[in-house]
Amino acid sequence: KRIELINTEKLLIDILISNSDRLRNVKLGEGELNFIINSKIPDLRIELTDFSTCFNLNSLVKPFRNIYVKNDLHGELFKTFLKVNEIDSNKHREFLDLLYDSLDSDSLPESFGAEDLFYVANDNLSLSPDQLYIHKSQIKNLSFLSDNELLQIYPNICALPNTDLFFNINGLNENNYLVLLSISPDLSINDIEKII
């Protein structure tokens, strides 16, 4: 049974590599993989998730020598993301500074941010990791946005293990178009509607 699973895993990897062009559309790729695999293992169901249609929180910093420093360009795009998600504009700068401080490697607080020593004085103790996020839920540790505001952005944020910010246009839909709108400021809602 174990050898069969290993062979199936190898088959899956080979299929993914040889069909990578056709699998750019996640749902299409998921269907094709399930069709191919179900002929060999009928009980196996494959689900693919495209993480290139969300705003990568880790893109708010960039590598510089051996540390991470804030990425001002992506910070401006994140403020646009907050704006199109109708988050109170008075919170944008402070929230962004808190994110920078939790992700960057230095010990210097941003204007509205806080590093570890500043968090200790807070009733809701929350030490910043000073490293890339492992999971998007770490944004909750900042205890800054209301639950409703967090729910507005949560489906469209992610924490990928890199500092890249990109969007897979093949995955564009009515649930994630605000991400594309925020990272491509030259596009209008009308442009995006035409693409969808």
Regions from the language model: what does each represent?
Residues 1-196:
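Compositionally biased linear targeting/interaction segments
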